UniProtKB/Swiss-Prot annotation:
Originating species: Eptatretus stoutii
Lineage: Eukaryota, Metazoa, Chordata, Craniata, Vertebrata
Top-level lineage group: Eukaryota
Disordered: annotated segments: 41-69
Family statement drawn from the similarity comment of this UniProt entry: Belongs to the Wnt family.
Biological process, per Gene Ontology: canonical Wnt signaling pathway; cell fate commitment; neuron differentiation
Role this protein plays: Ligand for members of the frizzled family of seven transmembrane receptors. Probable developmental protein. May be a signaling molecule which affects the development of discrete regions of tissues. Is likely to signal over only few cell diameters.
Name of the coding gene: WNT-9
Name listed for the protein in its UniProt record: Protein Wnt-9
Length: 130
């Protein structure tokens, strides 16, 4: 017959590129936070440590006692700044002396230090099948 007795609904993820774009937008406006403990009550609160991006300044946000804004549930937050991967450290060898492809990634890999170019000729056997 033409009647429906059961209706099935399901959730589906957005396309991968759309999810990546959304995550990148949130990353670009991520909020650095400070964790403060109320010694008397033993309660912990989280407060932003930097100003809100221009596009979010008109929106109302809850405040913690010292006047700092609390991040929303959808905000990406971080506690420490990322290390510079340009300089060598105990966590990273840095990017000095790395090979890059001119016009593609040298500006980012070389971290503004500039780079030397080299032209080379390479001969390889052709791997031909006769």
């Amino acid at each position: 017959s033409g009647s429906c007795t059961v209706r099935t609904c399901w959730r589906q993820l957005a396309p991968f590129t759309e999810m990546g774009r959304s995550l990148k937008q949130r990353y670009d406006v991520a909020v650095k936070v400070l964790s403060m403990t109320n010694e008397a009550a033993g309660e912990r609160t989280i407060a932003r440590s930097r100003r809100r991006p221009r596009e979010q300044r008109g929106q109302r946000r809850p405040k913690v006692s010292d006047g700092a804004l609390t991040p929303r549930g959808i905000d990406l937050v971080y506690v420490e700044d990322s290390p510079s991967y340009c300089r060598a450290s105990r966590y990273s060898p840095g990017t000095a002396n790395r090979s890059c492809q001119k016009g593609r990634n040298c500006d980012s890999i070389c971290c503004g230090r500039g780079y030397n170019t080299r032209v080379s000729s390479v001969q390889k056997p052709c791997q031909c099948q006769v």
